[in-house]
Amino acid sequence: MVQTDLRTAAWVCIAALSAIHSGAFASTTRDLPWYLEADSTRAAPASIQSAPIEPGQALITVAVIDSGVLKDHPALKGVLLPGFDMVSGPRNLRGGRSSNFEPDARDTSCGRNITSSSFRTHGTEVASIVAGNGYQNMWGVHPQARIVPIRVFGACGMAPDDMIDAIRWAAGLTVQGVPNNANPARVINVSIAGGASQCRPALQTAINEVTRKGTFVVVAAGNNFQRALAEPANCEGVISVGALSAENQITNYSALDPRTSIYTVGGGPPLRNNTPWANNKLRVATVEVGITGAENLVVADKGVGTSFAAPLVSGFLSLWLSHRPTLRPADWQSYADHFVRSVPQLTKCPDCNPNGLVIQQNIVKEKR
């Protein structure tokens, strides 16, 4: 979960999402990520054991509003659509907004000491969880989805107004001075948190606009160690996503708030057992730096945080919408009861009532 300057029973999407299309996984089921595993001998408690679900006929676009995406990563080949760099003003070291959605270079300093390289890798990692194409077994939840990458932060941080413009542009709304998005998203993933304790009116207005248009907004709850939701996860109309461990427990780093819509796999410290899920990390497309300083585009089991829980939900929604493209955000509550099961409650939040998503055989296709 990237921290930047920047609902009542908490449905918990245990988006292990073994309910992925069988065609894509037919030859690779022995090395699926543990959170996608359907095999009962390899499925973690936080996994869903269900029959694979073929994607529907509708092509669904997911916007990833993040640090940018590495367009040449082989795990995202054939997945990416044209995106945009929405970073404005002095924070944009390239001089201004453009169609170059790639992240800042790893050695970018922005005039201060950078202690994290997340601005280089974060967006690519998030996008791969949504729609990774199977390269080195980097399977996303819905590989047939298409990703529109939108960069809103880099080495110099993020301006709150850039987030508003990014959300509007992602859904196909007009943003002054920016060409229109030719591929409006049905799902917007925002794996960014740490903003204000109340949703700013301008941001809430933007979210209202895009949800009325039929776009789902999925937001990471934040890694604030069981404190209340911060912006943008505290805005009305978003699907805010907290994190579970492989053992189906709400993690100690996840935000904890009755308004949290869903908890799903976010990973954590390695488990002290020999299970296939003992690593307790999510598989991501990322960058490895060699001894010479050169970057290698790799796949690694290293993802931990609500940042990585959110794209599991975004991937599930895109899979669901591929069968039911007319569904809108207002429809989610009427469907959610068909997708939930309980997970252990924390005494620290007696009003949270967390439940988990169960994808029964063909439920995505058959539920009317």
Q: Where are the predicted features?
A:
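Bacterial N-terminal signal peptides that target proteins for export
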Residues: V2-W11
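Bacterial N-terminal signal peptides
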Residues: W11-I20
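Boundary at the C-terminal end of the N-terminal hydrophobic targeting segment
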Residues: A24-A26
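Active-site core segment of subtilase-fold serine proteases
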Residues: T28-A131, Y135-R146, D162-D165, W169, ...
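C-terminal subdomain of the subtilisin-like protease fold in secreted/lumenal serine endopeptidases
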Residues: E37, R42-A46, G172, V178-I192, ...
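Structural recognition of the beta-strand scaffold that forms the well-ordered cores
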Residues: T61-V64, S128, W139-G140, R146-R151, ...
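Extracellular S/T/G-rich loop segment that most often corresponds to the catalytic His/Ser-adjacent loop
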Residues: D66, V87-G89, A233-S322, T326
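Substrate-binding/access-modulating region of protease and related hydrolase catalytic domains
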Residues: T121, N133, V152-G237, E247-I250, ...
